[in-house]
Amino acid sequence: MSTESKCPFNHTAAGGTSNHDWWPNRLNLEVLHRHSALSDPMDAEFDYAQAFKQLDLAAVKRDLHALMTMSQDWWPADFGHYGGLFVRMAWHGAGTYRIADGRGGAGGGQQRFAPLNSWPDNGNLDKARRLLWPIKQKYGRNISWADLFILTGNVALESMGFKTFGYGGGRADTWEPDDVYWGSEKIWLELSGGPNSRYSGDRDLENPLAAVQMGLIYVNPEGPDGKPDPVAAARDIRDTFARMAMNDEETVALIAGGHTFGKTHGAGPASHVGAEPEAAGIEQQGLGWKSTYGSGKAGDAITSGLEVTWTSTPTQWSNDFFKHLFSYEWELTKSPAGAHQWVAKDAEAVIPDAFDPSKKHRPTMLTTDLSLRFDPAYEKISRRFYENPDEFADAFARAWFKLTHRDMGPRSRYLGPEVPAEELLWQDPIPAVDHPLIDDADAAALKAKILATGLTVAQLVSTAWASASTFRGSDKRGGANGARIRLAPQKDWAVNQPAALAAVLETLEGVQKAFNDAQTGGKKVSLADLIVLAGAAGVEQAAKQAGVAVTVPFAAGRMDASQEQTDVDAMAVLEPVADGFRNYLKAAYKTPAEALLVDKAQLLTLTAPEMTVLIGGLRVLGANAGGAQHGVFTDRPGTLSNDFFVNLLDMGTEWKPASAANDVFEGRDRASGQLKWTGTRVDLIFGSHSQLRALAEVYGSADANEKFVRDFVAAWNKVMNLDRFDLA
């Protein structure tokens, strides 16, 4: 018998076989319950925006400036200045952002949590965060970690002589890891071609991923799969940076600007490096990568395994990166750790050593640095920047600002005295309110006018949903404000039924014009407001037909953006590949439709109950794309009833697949075999999945219709106002 004591508690956080272990393909709803108030230690009334407004930002910056040259024995500063380390910290925090789903980025301070805190590409950034703790501790709740990371990157640049474009605060911290798909690989830095590879075909990177290997921010600095080919690496760079919304010019500016500072670390073999923070011993207190090579720090530090310093002034802004890139020929070599890198051929030793002032080194570069010279498009931009250093500085300042603010949403969310006055197209600008807004009486009169046009409940509801449901909680883009549903590209998306949409918008524009023309005091209603108001009118009418009197909340204040204020390419990524709320799939996908529904719900910041009640309501209101009848489990469409749930849960119906792909099903009378309904996976999951069925049973009960209506209205109102940051 074993003498090892067994823990008497078998239900602790230490483990046990989970549901996911037993049923790995089971639909995971946990993503809908992340970041709840239960995980937030701040008081319920805490308002981070108000707390930040009380911050003495200048004092924080003074402390950060002092920190830059306050080298600590436990992690000494390269060249006596932490600037390069902090630039990397901010870059890697923001650089996880990807345009496909808006996830990643600097918001929330996710670099504090797994997996990002333990990614190989984030090696030794744990030390950067610990260096910041005294400052975070000093200012407490008035500045979030997320804001502090980016501010520190800015101050690092400024302390090294660079003029930044600006800074906006407002990133509230999160308190647990995001649930983000970073890839299927089971091994850090796994090469392409493996069983879980993110690549297919001719090096086609899986969407929505924006990094070439698991655990990297963008590209492998040694080249694709570690092969030192600068031209091939350029393809990876262009692909990954484009997936983060950066064009070629911004890409060159970011790489060259960032690599003007600091160095990489590869003093010895990686075998000396210990476990990452999440796997390190408890006594290391959240630090990782403890190295046994020499002192394990300073000149003995090992991070990427590369040992490169790009410029002769690594703590000062300069044009040295391009000077060295074009002044030398480069030959392939290896770092002390054995990593592929390049050294200037027949060059003098002009690069200072990070810790020994008596030493000098020849200029060195990464494979991905040389891409800026040997890729024709990058080379043209690089030479222009080399010959026009002021243009380069401006391009880097703007690209850095975009990098570090891309996931913050509209400019109205930026806080602090350093927010730049210039409005930028990538911020999806919307005009400021410049006229008196409609009041409750106006709203009621307008709803009556809308209903009198003859537009159906389905038309009103589907148009409002199409407008508002573009919102992504990940990067705060999209939503009803701006009425971009009437502009390219949204007006032409297949899911929006362009011809039918145009007819609805034309009718609503007529109502808008009649109202605005009748006003004498300058009062106006925007089309953005009117679209949402029309949806409210449709919902109220449908609820009335179900015997429930309800008023959908409405707050005026949206404005209409112009086509000139809309970046068509940047807006195109908001087009849904799937919208289960409208029973829409753009194409056939490997990912099951029900999983895509949950993904959409998470982007809309919905809980599982909110997702459930919205599905049930939108089905009976006839909001399906193209008027499809799948999931319309009612004989009274246009009435806001709980029929979807009642009929889905009816044991008198037997369901069978009606397609080889198991994506459409027929529900027949169990006794007669007569066809009653058709449905998709998105419909049937609410009867199949045990947790969703439990929710469906609440709304399918005999006493549930009024609760169903009121819960639907609450969830509907939430979606309509997701982008109303002015109401928060």
Swiss-Prot record:
Q: Which GO terms describe its molecular function?
A: catalase activity; heme binding; metal ion binding
Residues noted as binding heme b in the record, renumbered to the chain? H259
Q: Name one GO biological process term.
A: hydrogen peroxide catabolic process
Query: Which terms are listed as keywords in the entry?
Result: Heme, Hydrogen peroxide, Iron, Metal-binding, Oxidoreductase, Peroxidase
Q: Which residues are the active-site ones?
A: H92
**Which EC number applies?**
1.11.1.21
Q: Name one GO cellular component term.
A: cytosol
Instruction: Please describe the post-translational modifications of this protein.
Output: Formation of the three residue Trp-Tyr-Met cross-link is important for the catalase, but not the peroxidase activity of the enzyme.
Oxidoreductase keyword on record: yes
Q: How is the cofactor bound?
A: Binds 1 heme b (iron(II)-protoporphyrin IX) group per dimer.
Pfam families according to UniProt: peroxidase (PF00141)
Q: Where is this site: Transition state stabilizer?
A: R88
Query: Where is the crosslink of kind Tryptophyl-tyrosyl-methioninium (Trp-Tyr) (with M-244)?
Result: W91-Y218
Q: Which CDD domains match?
A: catalase_peroxidase_1, catalase_peroxidase_2
Q: Which reaction does it catalyse?
A: H2O2 + AH2 = A + 2 H2O; 2 H2O2 = O2 + 2 H2O
- Crosslink feature (Tryptophyl-tyrosyl-methioninium (Tyr-Met) (with W-91)) location: Y218-M244
Cofactor field? heme b
- What family classification does the UniProt entry report for this protein? Belongs to the peroxidase family. Peroxidase/catalase subfamily.
Q: Which HAMAP family match?
A: Catal_peroxid
- State its role: Bifunctional enzyme with both catalase and broad-spectrum peroxidase activity.
Assembly and partners?
A: Homodimer or homotetramer.
Q: Tell me the protein's name.
A: Catalase-peroxidase 1
- The species this protein belongs to is Burkholderia vietnamiensis (strain G4 / LMG 22486) (Burkholderia cepacia (strain R1808))
